[in-house]
Amino acid sequence: MDIDSIYLTKEDLEKFQNVDMTKLSPGHEIARDIFMVGVWTAQRVSDYNNIGRDDIQTLTIRSIVDEPDPENVGKTIAKIVTREVTVINIRQKKTGAKVAIPCSSDLKRILEKYNFQMPHLEDQVINRYIKDIGKAAGLTEIVNIVKTNGGEEKEVPTEKYKLIHTHTARRTGATLMYLSGMDVYDIIKITGHTSPVMLRKYIKADELEVVEKITEKYKYFD
C-alpha cells in the first residue's frame, strides 16, 4: 500500500500548537513538542527524537554593517556588530551527514521548556498521540491519498489528521522553508539531502503555493 505524504501548512501548525492540552495526557504534550522540534529542524525522527545538551551550542556571529557617519552627512562608517545564535549540531543516523541547524525562536522556546534536554518517546507512541492532537485541532480536511493494491491505484478520501506521523514533521519543515523563499542549497545544508533534485522530490507544496511564492519573490510577474 502506497500513501501520498502530506505536510502541515502554517495554519495547520497554529491549530496544532494551540490545542488545549489540559484535555489530553501529559504524554500528548511531550509528543507534540517532540514533533514540533522535528518541524523546526526538518530532521528525521531518529535525529530529532534524541536532541540533548551535547547537541546544542551558542555561536557568536560577527558581521560588518554600514551606519550613518554622525560627523559627515551623507557618508557611512563600518561597524562590527555581534550577535549570538543558538545552533543544533547533528550527525544524521541514516547517512552520517553532519548538519547545523540555527534555532528559531519557536524551537528555542521548546528546548528551554525542557532545559535543553528533550524527552524521548517511542515512535509508535508519538504517532498515536499526534493523530489525537491533529483531531483535536480540527485537521479534518479531506485529502485524497493514493493506495496501490494488486498493481491497481485508487484514490481514497481520508481526513488529514489520520495521515500525520513522525516523518510529517521533516516534510513540513522542508516545505515551509522552501515556501518562505529560502534557497534550496541552504535548505539541503540543513536537511542533509544530497542534491536540490532530491529535495524537490521531497517538498509537498501544491501548484498554487508555488505560484504564490514565485510571484512574491520575482517582479517579472507583476
Protein language model annotation of sequence segments:
Residues K15-M21, L59-A136:
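Basic, alpha-helical nucleic-acid-contacting "clamp/cap" segments
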Residues H28-R32, N127, H167-R171:
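Short, leucine-enriched amphipathic alpha-helices that occur as contiguous helical runs
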Residues K23-L24, F116-H120, K131-K189:
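Short, basic (Lys/Arg/His-rich) helix/loop patches that form interaction surfaces
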Residues M1-V45, N49, Q124:
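Basic, Lys/Arg- and aromatic-enriched nucleic-acid-binding interface segment
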Residues G38-K79, D186:
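Short, charged phosphate-coordinating catalytic segments
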Residues E14, A42, S46-N50, I101, ...:
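Feature representing long, continuous alpha-helical segments
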Residues F16-V19, K75-I77, K201-D222:
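DNA/chromatin major-groove-contacting recognition/catalytic segments
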Residues Q92-T95, V184, T191-E216:
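Catalytic-site neighborhood detector that most strongly recognizes the C-terminal catalytic loop/helix
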